[in-house]
Regions:
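Juxtamembrane and boundary regions of transmembrane helices in multi-pass small-molecule transporters
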Residues: 1-19, 100, 137-141, 156-259, ...
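Interfacial loop-to-helix junctions that mark the boundaries of transmembrane helices
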Residues: 1-2, 24-32, 44, 71-80, ...
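Hydrophobic alpha-helical transmembrane segments
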Residues: 7-8, 33-34, 38, 52-56, ...
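Membrane-embedded alpha-helical segments and adjacent helix-loop junctions characteristic
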Residues: 22, 52-162, 314, 318-320, ...
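Flexible hinge motifs at transmembrane-helix junctions and intramembrane kinks/re-entrant loops
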Residues: 23-31, 38-56, 73, 226-227, ...
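Structural signature of hydrophobic alpha-helical transmembrane segments
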Residues: 25-35, 79-90, 287-297, 347-359, ...
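Transmembrane alpha-helix interface/packing and boundary motifs in multi-pass membrane proteins
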Residues: 41-50, 126-136, 177-188, 278-284, ...
Length: 467
């Protein structure tokens, strides 16, 4: 479809909902905002223009139609969680600039990369180590891990689009992408979608999920998947090359090229560790996670690891500010205007007598496998989280459990297609894995991941007293 067709469909969806009859329990301005919000989501999916532009269209439409005021329209930009992810994206630029991420990766490969399976675990550890401070999994996967995977593959004469792709490149690309989707489960600050979920949850239910609560819910399924997935993929989609002694030599050459560890790397490493400690101990220090992230950014600037020009040029952070501020603001207003509550009550009445825990299993599976219809995790969260979460809460599910459950379910769907998340086209686009194979292997990974995340996450929440 061309731009005009996609834009026309977006507007058409909004107009249809606008003029549909609705219950008197929803005020006209609430219904009109729902129409605009839905059209904005459709715009995110069809993308006649970039996400940030579609978000601005949503704000303008809501204000022009007097569905909300200008102050209300901009209220989402004052949300602390929105600024948390923006600040964390800026901090991740300091990690990339310093070269610390590459040094960690090549050090692990030099030490443990004697086989293709061990190489996969070394790459997994790299992603895990840097994920708490890189909330853009696209930047983490595409900017740090992917180039390393590509270099390793080419070093073993594993070329894309040919007979040599299966030598090692296809396996490493698949595994690195899968791990990138798993680390987002463990740390709240490892993915923008996580903070979108907690922001929407806070707006709808008035409950703020802490960094530590997220870690408690995600660490058990996350660690299980981190250990299991490289081996599982090795079994269902094995590389032709099993032993890789040359990898250590290649890694040493890369480390030699990087030279001795720099002051910038040391300072970023110290700041990185301190930020994680402060996030993890916020329950005692009372420091808001957003303040901690901003402290990390300022520390990077003071130590010279980051400049104001770097911050101004970090397009991902500013883009997130625009679209996430819009979504969080609109979702909060839909809650205040009673739209979400009316919908949740209607659905829960039709599910009366159905146990909320088993309903959460079914709704979680629906949430995960709906990813086939969305071109990003963000679009799926935006479209489904508020409604699905409200239904579960109306059925009796605890609010913290509900919010964290959807956080856990953000991961399994990201392996399903070659367009499931922002980082997916980078690994798929390398040309090592055919589309049909990507979908087939991705489905197998997703099923295992879903079961581990649901049952492991539920056990973790029970173990730590959240459930």
């Amino acid at each position: 479809m061309n731009t005009f067709t996609r834009a026309a469909l977006t507007v058409l969806v909004g107009l249809v909902i606008w003029f549909l009859p609705h219950t008197e329990a929803i005020k006209p301005e609430g219904w009109h905002l729902l129409a605009i919000f839905t059209a904005t989501i459709v715009g995110f999916i069809l993308r006649p223009w970039p996400t940030g532009i579609m978000a601005l269209f949503g704000i303008v439409a809501a204000v022009v139609t007097k569905s909300i005021t200008m102050v209300q329209a901009l209220g989402g930009y004052a949300e602390a969680n929105v600024w948390l992810i923006v600040a964390a994206v800026f901090f991740s630029r300091g990690i990339i600039n310093s070269g610390l991420g590459k040094r960690i990766a090549y050090t692990l490969i030099r030490s443990f990369g004697t086989s293709s399976l061990k190489l996969a675990y070394a790459l997994a550890c790299t992603d895990l180590i840097i994920s708490p401070a890189t909330p853009s999994n696209t930047a983490r996967g595409g900017g740090i891990v992917f180039p390393i995977v590509q270099n390793i593959s080419l070093a073993f004469d594993s070329e894309p689009y040919g007979n040599t792709a299966r030598r090692i490149g296809a396996y490493l690309m698949t595994t690195a992408h899968t791990i990138n989707t798993i680390t987002v489960t463990i740390f709240l600050t490892a993915c923008s979608g996580n903070l979108l979920i907690t922001s929407l949850g806070a707006k709808l239910f008035g409950y703020d999920i802490s960094w530590w609560e997220w870690f408690q819910a995600g660490v058990i399924p996350g660690v299980i998947c981190m250990i299991l997935m490289p081996w599982f993929i090795y079994k269902i989609y094995p590389p032709e090359i099993k032993e890789t002694p040359e990898a250590a030599v290649m890694a040493q050459k890369e480390l030699d090229a990087l030279g001795p560890i720099t002051k910038a790397e040391i300072s970023v490493a110290i700041i990185f560790v301190l930020c994680i400690l402060l996030w993890a101990t916020a329950i005692w220090t009372k420091l808001h996670p957003t303040v901690v992230a901003m402290m990390g950014v300022l520390a990077c600037v003071v130590t010279g690891s980051l400049t104001w020009e770097d911050i101004l040029g970090e397009r991902t952070g500013w883009d997130i500010l625009i679209w996430m501020g819009t979504l969080v603001g609109m979702a909060g207003l839909l809650g205040k205007l009673g739209v979400v509550a009316v919908f949740a009550d209607f659905v829960s009445q039709h599910l009366a007598g159905f146990d909320w825990f088993w309903a959460s299993f079914i709704i979680s599976a629906t949430f995960v496998y709906s990813q086939y219809f969305f071109a990003s995790g963000t679009a799926r969260i935006t479209a489904l989280f508020s409604a699905f979460a409200a239904i579960l809460v109306a059925m009796g599910a605890p609010i913290p459990f509900t919010i964290l459950l959807f956080g856990l379910m953000n991961s399994p769907g990201c392996t399903l297609t070659h367009y499931s998340s922002g980082v997916t086209p980078i690994f798929f686009g390398a040309g090592y894995v055919p589309q049909g194979t990507w979908w087939r292997v991705g489905l197998a990974i997703s099923v295992v991941s879903f079961l581990i995340h649901f049952w492991g996450g539920t056990f973790g929440m029970w173990l730590f007293g959240i459930l």
